[in-house]
Amino acid sequence: MKSMSILLQNDTILHIGIDDTDSPKGMCTTFLSYKIVKFLERQEIEFVDFPSLIRFNPNIPWRTRGNGAVRLTIRTKNPKKIKNKITQFVTSYSDTKNGANPGLVFFQNKQIPVSFNKFSKLALCKLISRKHAKQFVSENNIESFYLGNGQGLVGAIGAIGYKFFDHTFELLCYRKKSQFGKKRRISKSSVKNMQSTTFPETFSSYDKESDRVLITPHGPDPVFYGIRGETIKSVVRASTLVNSDEKLDGYMIFKSNQGTGDHLNNELQVDELKPFNSGFLIGEVCNKPVIERGGHVFFSIKVKDRKIRCAVYKPTKITNVAQNLILGDKI
């Protein structure tokens, strides 16, 4: 028992944050994380939690797709070896030739400092500069690595600092390298059946109105499909109902804030409205909604004696609600 106690005392909790390893032309930070996890499974480590996929502010203009960063948390006796190997993975797999600016952050401690939590909360709803991220790393003496301009440090820091108050799960299936960039062939009828069988335990799989499969991306990235759901059991079950002839490399389940509306829990200050911020305002409709070219609806609300112009764009599918607003409605 004494030897076991010594071993436990020598263990280190290592938090790993990764972001911006992909580009519109390829790669995916979750796929890189999948490769890292496959490596870690062969090491003498223990996973403390599920891999976490944190989707930050969706209004960031230079996001590749879902503005997601990844956190891995492990217990290890050899953090130096692990960190060196993960740095090699990020260097080798990141699509820097097509504009990726990867960031990698390591933090060794069981407890995450409040400063990380505050940074993460800002990243959910605001635009954080690279300068701010690099300053945070320097002031807190954080071990980090980046390529390009270091934009990925923002998500990497934020991923480590993120606190789950609600979560869903996302099962991501990955293609073999020989299939990257090729058309994804998946049975639409099987996805329709999967949704009707597993909803509401799974969500955002198929759009009935447009008769469109939602689980498959459209770019050349390594993801074949992703299923989102409320439980591990539900996403695994759903994946068994999806039919395709393509032989896949494997899959990984992430704990995620996808579908929780986390970035909308921020009440915006009417005197501090800025482009790209996410959040909500509460006000009263003060002019009649107008439908403009393209079917988009525009109106204004009054918030603390300030008039704020609002737009509801047609792709949101709530323009019918918006155009029926009347003066005095509180929204």
How would you label these PLM feature ranges?
Residues 11-55:
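N-terminal ordered "arm"
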Residues 25, 78-85:
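Short, conserved charged micro-motifs
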Residues 316-331:
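Short nucleic-acid-contacting surface segments enriched for D/E, G, S/T with interspersed K/R
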